[in-house]
Amino acid sequence: MTAGSALAEHIAALRLVDNHVHGFWLSAGDRRRFENGLNEANTDPLADFDSGFDTQLGFAVRAHCAPLLGLPGHVDPQRYWERRSGVSEPDLARVFLPAAGVSDWLVDTGLPGDIAGLAEMAEASGGRAHEIVRLEQVAEQAAAAPGDYADAFRAILHERARTAVGTKSVLAYRGGFDGDLS
């Protein structure tokens, strides 16, 4: 065995840690929701003339996910969407997540909506799911709690962080560091 092939075998056997994911959708949605999901860091919806398929992530989805659905890599976006939309979101997760070669998922649980939680992510992927607490969600929960905001924030964060592996904030990448926090 050559050194190059030994290295290739070693790399192929490595399991990955995905350090930033959200749970998968639990219910069907339309194509716009899917394409805007490919644009997650930008909170503005895609323009009507734009497509999430025309991004590096969109190209990767068609290259790697389409074959798992029995389609050729880089298939036309419409054909990909038609095949994908014929499969439930949880079933898609059970196909795509194990194929990613990830052993541990660090899940930002701060997105609202009908989204899989930690147990569902672990079950669908065959791996382990760990919570990343989004601080903005803690702030929203503290603002809705009775009593002193700072005390509520501390208590909620303490409880949520008890089993979490980390925290995160989306403030800087959504609005920059010059935002008015008053």
Placement of each model-derived feature along the sequence:
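Metal-cofactor-binding active-site regions of metalloenzymes
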Residues: 2-182
